[in-house]
Each structure stands twice: as structure tokens, then as C-alpha cells.
């Protein structure tokens, strides 16, 4: 069975959720549903998957420190990698950067599980079933 590399896309400014989100504090870093941010909720979702590699988090340079702080607060990931986007250019370049990184650091055949940090998944059990398929 191929290894699964969770890739959490946490870039962007969250400008469509203004005034809640700001350029330096975008929606993926906000606590909108419960006591965890959308990024933290996504990390928890990925950490509950069986036999996955440590998460790869793609984030803009300006959010690197708060991202690290939020990940470390969870204490759910002993290991993780933050991959910095020098410039935000939307989803495709972020996924390409993650694929290139994974190709250099993981075994051939590793499957990338792309997880936008600002998505809300209500049925965790079904999510896990679909990923397992």
C-alpha cells in the first residue's frame, strides 16, 4: 500500500471573510467553529488517519510563525514540515511545490492527500473511509 502524505494548504489572506480575517491573520488561523482554528481542525483531521506520513503544511512567509505556534499548541504532530510559499499564487503552485518536496523526501508512489486548511468536514468517519479507499 502506498504511503499517504497529508498536504495542508494554509496560504492565502482570507480576504473574502473580512472583517473577521485580516491580511496578517487570515481565516485559516481563526477559531470559527470551536476552540481550534481551521488550520488546527485540519491538522487534527489528518492526524486521525491511520498510517499517514507527518503533515506537510504549505503556508505564506508572513504566516510561518503563527502557523508553527498553532501546530505546536495541538501537540498532535510529533513531526511536521512547513513549506514556505515565497509569493501566494493560489492552489496549483502550492500543490506543485508540495509534490516536488514529496518527490525529494518520500518513497516513489507516495500519494498526496490535499487538504485545504479552511474546509469544514462534519462527518469525520466518512472522511476516513473515503481516504482509506
Predicted regions and their residues:
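Conserved N-terminal catalytic core of the sugar/cofactor nucleotidyltransferase
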Residues: 1-8, 15-26, 31-116, 122-128, ...
